[in-house]
Amino acid sequence: MNEEYWILEVKVTPKSRENKIVGFEGEVLKIRVTEAPEKGKANEAVIALLAKTLSLPKRDVTLISGETSRKKRLLLPKSTESIISHWREHGL
């Protein structure tokens, strides 16, 4: 399977009250997760939340940079780009 991919920039707030996709700040998607930023738990929560929301298997959401930062870059299937663009333009 040779599907094209694109990069989504996200800003993560760990140790929040709930797992939630908040919305956009410019071109960056803001996400809150309940997990602490320890041993990759917050990263795993971000991947799980996006995968569930976009109806993707977790293996299709790949962290490519920002492993220890609040600002992260994720690789997503090209098929999700129109969904994310809709969120950006019309809200979640």
UniProtKB/Swiss-Prot annotation:
Superkingdom of origin: Bacteria
Disulfide partners: none
Gene3D superfamilies in the record: YggU-like
SUPFAM superfamilies the UniProt entry points to: YggU-like
GO cellular component: cytoplasm
SMART domains hit by this protein: DUF167
Pfam families for this protein: DUF167
Family statement: Belongs to the UPF0235 family.
PANTHER family named in the record: UPF0235 PROTEIN C15ORF40
Protein name: UPF0235 protein CCA_00247
Protein source organism: Chlamydia caviae (strain ATCC VR-813 / DSM 19441 / 03DC25 / GPIC)
